Regions:
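A feature for loop-to-transmembrane-helix boundaries and adjacent hydrophobic helices
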Residues: 1-158
């Protein structure tokens, strides 16, 4: 089962690398206004009006018909591509069956936790500013660390 999990996450993360580009095609899952190197311009009429924040509107000047935002789909796609490469490089050095899957969960959760903070369409816990996806991603990271440490500790005790 754990060998199957290791193999399955490789296909899963490759699907995520490719699938995030669907967010670009749909003009969704972007971040707040930015003027950094990776800033992406979206035509205002191609974006749902409720997704344009006050900060974005503040940077729209007369005669300009676009918003300039963080391309969070690109950040996540690139993060997942790097994670995929690292997992494939580590494959021959794994210490136990299922370790690649655990490392994927931890790495994906870490990236998602950071990138999700840039997005403007977050689902927040009621009466808080906490994004549900960031909390779940954080739990995934903690879970991965606990499992990795506990399995390695048990292996060294044998």
């Amino acid at each position: 089962f754990f060998r199957l999990c290791d193999t399955g996450v490789v296909g899963l993360i490759l699907g995520q690398v490719i699938g995030r580009w669907g967010n670009f095609m749909n003009r969704e899952a972007f971040g707040e206004y930015t003027d950094n190197l990776f800033a992406m311009r979206l035509p205002i009429d191609a974006v749902r009006q409720h997704e344009i924040t006050e900060t974005m509107w503040a940077h729209v000047t007369e005669g300009v018909n676009y918003i300039q935002v963080h391309p969070t789909f690109l950040y996540e796609s690139m993060w997942n591509l790097v994670l995929l490469c690292l997992l494939l490089l580590y494959w021959k050095h794994k210490k136990f069956e299922g370790e690649i899957a655990i490392l994927y969960f931890g790495g994906y959760g870490l990236g998602r936790c950071m990138i999700e903070g840039l997005r403007t369409d977050q689902l927040l816990l009621p009466h808080t500013n906490l994004a549900v996806s960031q909390i779940l991603a954080g739990i995934l990271v903690v879970f991965a660390i606990v499992v990795e440490v506990s399995v390695r500790t048990k292996k060294t005790q044998v």
